[in-house]
Structure formats: C-alpha cells, structure tokens
Amino acid sequence: MLPPSEPLPRAVVPRIALLGGESSGKTTLARALADALATAWVPEYGRQRWEELRATLSADELLRVARTQVDWEQAHAARSHGWLVCDTTPLTTLQYCLHDHGHAPAELHGLARRRYDVTVVCAPDFEFVQDGCRRDAAFRAAQHAWTLERLHEQGVQALTVHGSVQSRVAQMLDHLARHQGAAPALPEPLAAHANQSEQPWP
C-alpha cells in the first residue's frame, strides 16, 4: 500500500457510497476498501442508534439518523486521504422510514437524494447472517430491489459488486481506476490484499 497523501479540504473530498440490504457485506467492504485506499471510512450511525434504543425508530428519529450520518461524513472527511468511504447513506434511512411508517419527512426525502462521486451496491449473493439486529433474508432482498429502483429513478449509475471481500475490493479498485478522472490517485490495486486468502463473510 502506498503511504497516505495529505488530507484534502472537506469540501472537495470525493465520496464513495456503499449501499445494499442488511447482511450484504457493506461494513466489511467499507473497512477493506478504506484499508486498500489508505483512507478513512464512515460507520453506519443508524445501527448504533438502534443498538442504543433497541426499538423501532420513529420517523423523527430516523431523520435525526440521516442528519447525523451526513455530519459524520463531514467529520471523517477531515481525516480522509483522497477518497472517503461511506458505509450507507440517507437513502437507506429513507427506506427504513417508508417501510416502517409508510411516510417520511420531506427533509429526509431531500437527504436521500444526496449525491456521491461513486455509488456501489453490494449484492446479497451469500447466506443471510443474523446478528440480533437484522430482520430476515426476504427483507434484505426487498431492500436490494428498492435501492436499485430508487437509484435508477434518481439517475444514479451504480456499480453492483459480487463475491468475496477480496473480489469486491478488486472490482471497486478497477472501477475507480477506470473512472477516477481528476480524483485522487489510487494505490497499486490490491497491494494490501494480493497475498491474502479469500475471506468469508461475517
């Protein structure tokens, strides 16, 4: 892995959004991709908030989750080196709100249209893993389909990644290398992962 470059100003840090249903490997991929890019990643605040309350979050609480997720992006951008990897976006929060309550605040709809430089959808192509916080495989499949539909409606061209952790990181690095344009330079693809064996999903 190449040494990290100097941090960019928060306003110009390019963001990578990782989306997908529950148990689709977003957090595992966020960590691995951030490691490969020698940069920072933004954890999912919604999960933390649910673990604190252990209850269905109200529409107002979900709006707070979306606002906090964006605030965390801004805070982590100051520590990023080139790219900022975002483990979910307010689009996911909107999906929970609509599913659980049938409606969502107008502000949440607006936050869900937040744009990212690269949008990635994690395919639900491995066995569903229940960790006590998640729902079930059918809900995961519905989330995946809903996410793809909403991105299409918004005109967002998303990359869907498949397979193991290493395979997904390789797909991401290849995509970034082909589409980076004026974005920060990438490290050698998979430099930190090339000699690792395939990692199972948690």
How should these model regions be labeled?
Residues 1-14:
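Extreme N-terminal, non-catalytic leader segments
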Residues 2-3, 159-160, 174-202:
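C-terminal accessory "lid"/substrate-recognition subdomains
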Residues 18:
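Hydrophobic anchor at the beta1->P-loop junction of P-loop NTPases
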Residues 21:
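P-loop (Walker A) phosphate-binding loop of NTP-binding proteins
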Residues 26:
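Conserved lysine of the Walker
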Residues 31-74:
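Conserved substrate/cofactor phosphate-moiety recognition/catalytic segment
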Residues 63-114, 121, 129:
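Glycine-rich phosphate-binding loop used to anchor ATP phosphates in small-molecule kinases
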Residues 101-167, 171, 180, 187-191:
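A glycine- and Lys/Arg-enriched "phosphate-lid" helix/loop adjacent to the NTP-binding pocket
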